[in-house]
From Swiss-Prot:
GO terms for cellular component: membrane. It comes from Schizosaccharomyces pombe (strain 972 / ATCC 24843) (Fission yeast). This is Uncharacterized protein C11D3.19. It is a single-pass membrane protein. The chain crosses the membrane at residues 57-76. It is found in: Membrane. Keywords: Membrane, Transmembrane, Transmembrane helix.
């Protein structure tokens, strides 16, 4: 089991809430994606890696969107 800070997750067009997510996420962002997206979809389309690659801009944008979606979900509860 690798520490979550070293874990990265790369997704390509995976259903996540109201949109499909593509990009690479690391550490806490990867955990956020696991929580926000349909777990089954994530695990079947995921490439796990412990390399320290740079994160793409699209991944940052997707993370922001996922965080906003989580915020709005909290508001509506």
């Amino acid at each position: 089991m690798v520490p979550y800070t070293e874990t990265s997750i790369c997704l390509t067009n995976v259903p996540c809430g109201y949109m499909n997510v593509s990009g690479c996420f690391k550490g806490a962002d990867a955990l956020t994606i696991l929580h926000e997206c349909d777990e089954a979809n994530v695990y079947t389309a995921t490439f796990w890696s412990t390399s320290s690659g740079t994160r793409r801009n699209s991944a940052v944008i997707c993370t922001l969107i996922a965080n906003l979606m989580a915020f709005f979900m909290l508001l509506t509860m």
